[in-house]
Each structure stands twice: as C-alpha cells, then as structure tokens.
C-alpha cells in the first residue's frame, strides 16, 4: 500500500468535509460583551447543582449598536457538563427590539469561567433587525471567573 497516496486521499477528504461544514455557518452576525450575575437555584436533580444567571451588556449585531439583557438557567448533568436555557432575552437598539431564546451545552474551564456552545432563535418586527427572523444562529459564549462574558453569533446557512 502506498501510504503517501493514502494519506493524501485522507487529507483531501478531510479538507472537503471541512469546507462543507464551514459553508454551513455564515459570517459573524455580531458580538456582545456581557456582565453575568449568578445565583444557585434548586435543580431538583438528585443533588446536582443548577444556576440562574442574568446577563446585561452590549455590542454589535448586524452592524447596529445593541444592548441586551437575558436570564439563563443551567443545570449540571451527571457527566459534569452543563445544559443551559435562556427562555427570555431581549436586544435593544435605536432601530427597534428583538427577543430571543437560546439553548447550549457548556463546561467549567480551569480558569474558573465557563464555555458554552449552542443555538439561538430571534423574533423582531424591526425592519433593521429583520434579518434575524427565520434563521437559526450558532453561538460561542465564554466567561471569566469575574463574570465578564463574550457572546458571538453566526447564522446557519
């Protein structure tokens, strides 16, 4: 067997699959810097912890200066990861408002912060933010031990 040829085929296949996956996500729709405030809540899950986290902050979304507020709940799962839900988030900008819901899975980082990946859906009647409607957005969410967080959004194509 020609290992050089075999490896070349594997690398080519990997690159083609990677290109396909990258096409699934569009260009970054926005980024926001947030401040978290968290408190423990009853999880009802056999002694595993749960947290309620409120966030407030701002940044850019679809080229607009925005402010956002949301409340998330996250429940620790038996494997130590966290399952998070935001049932009510709001985006404010001079051109209108939008609401959103998110779900994500995350883990504690060695630094003491958290790292989540997930998806969000938005609804708005604002023409300026109307591009949010009817799309699913993937997100990355990272926070530090002091509760300073970064939220980055990417539309799924």
Question: Model-found features: residue ranges?
Answer:
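Beta-strand-enriched cores of mature, soluble protein domains
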Residues: 11-157
């Amino acid at each position: 067997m020609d290992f050089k040829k075999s490896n070349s085929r594997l690398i080519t296949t990997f690159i083609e699959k990677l290109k396909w996956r990258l096409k699934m996500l569009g260009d970054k729709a926005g980024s926001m810097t947030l401040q978290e405030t968290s408190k423990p809540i009853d999880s009802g899950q056999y002694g595993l912890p749960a947290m309620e986290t409120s966030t407030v902050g701002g940044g850019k979304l679809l080229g607009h200066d925005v402010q956002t507020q949301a409340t998330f709940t996250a429940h620790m799962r038996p494997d130590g990861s966290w399952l998070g839900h935001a049932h009510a988030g709001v985006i404010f900008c001079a051109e209108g408002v939008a609401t959103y819901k998110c779900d994500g899975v995350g883990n504690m980082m060695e630094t003491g912060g958290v790292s989540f990946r997930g998806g969000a859906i938005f609804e708005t009647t604002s023409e300026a933010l109307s591009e949010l409607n009817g799309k699913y957005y993937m997100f990355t969410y990272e926070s530090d031990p002091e509760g300073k967080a970064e939220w980055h959004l990417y539309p799924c194509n």
